[in-house]
């Protein structure tokens, strides 16, 4: 039996359509009860969703809201980040798709900060349990009006509906990271 000549072209077109649709992510929060354990030992538990906020709780700490899977309020050090989140409006990044970018500025303490958040790419990387998983890499470039610079990166896993890794560094030599090492459902 001979296959029609157009079949390879049709197959390639369909495969491309499936791949492209797999590289977007609608906003979603982790399922309630899911526990994320970081390399530092800190654990957070998903509690539900309220609009673009995921309701979360730090084990041994308190509840917080995670806006657009990126920014927590209150922050881990207890600071209210409402004004910062309102200025950035990170929910505009959703649905996630490589190449999408938003910009914002924020004034505080007599200074102005400019932010560019971008969905840099869709990539496979090592995740919890050393498994290869699909992620979206989001970068936030922050510049201050006095030459300050920093970059933050989140790797959001569609399968977990959570950032499985976060990295931060600035022009003053400060750096931080948080890596999810275990997920319990």
Question: What role is predicted for each listed range?
Answer:
Residues 10, 40-42, 88:
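Prokaryotic Sec-type signal peptides and long signal-anchor helices
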Residues 1-5:
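Positively charged n-region of N-terminal signal peptides that target proteins for export
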Residues 8-17:
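Bacterial N-terminal signal peptides
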Residues 18-22:
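Sec/Tat signal peptide C-region and signal peptidase I cleavage site
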Residues 79-88:
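Acidic/charged, solvent-exposed loop-and-adjacent secondary-structure segments enriched in E/D, K/R, S/T
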Residues 23-78, 94-185:
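Acidic, serine/threonine-rich low-complexity disordered tracts
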Residues 6-8, 180:
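Short helix-onset patch at the extreme N-terminus, typifying the N->h transition
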């Amino acid at each position: 039996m001979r296959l029609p000549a157009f079949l390879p072209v049709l197959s390639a077109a369909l495969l491309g359509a499936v791949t492209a649709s797999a590289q977007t992510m609608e906003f979603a929060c982790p399922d309630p009860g899911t526990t994320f354990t970081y390399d530092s030992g800190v654990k957070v538990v998903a509690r539900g969703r309220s609009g673009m906020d995921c309701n979360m709780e730090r084990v041994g700490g308190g509840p917080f809201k995670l806006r657009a899977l990126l920014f927590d309020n209150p922050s881990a050090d207890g600071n209210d980040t409402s004004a910062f989140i309102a200025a950035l409006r990170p929910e505009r990044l959703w649905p996630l798709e490589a190449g999408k970018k938003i910009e914002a500025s924020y004034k505080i303490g007599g200074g102005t900060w400019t932010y560019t958040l971008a969905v840099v790419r869709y990539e496979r990387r090592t995740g919890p349990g050393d498994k290869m998983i699909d992620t979206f890499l989001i970068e936030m470039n922050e510049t201050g009006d006095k030459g300050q610079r920093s970059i933050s990166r989140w790797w959001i896993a569609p399968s977990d509906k959570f950032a499985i890794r976060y990295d931060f560094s600035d022009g003053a030599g400060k750096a931080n990271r948080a890596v999810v090492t275990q997920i319990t459902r």
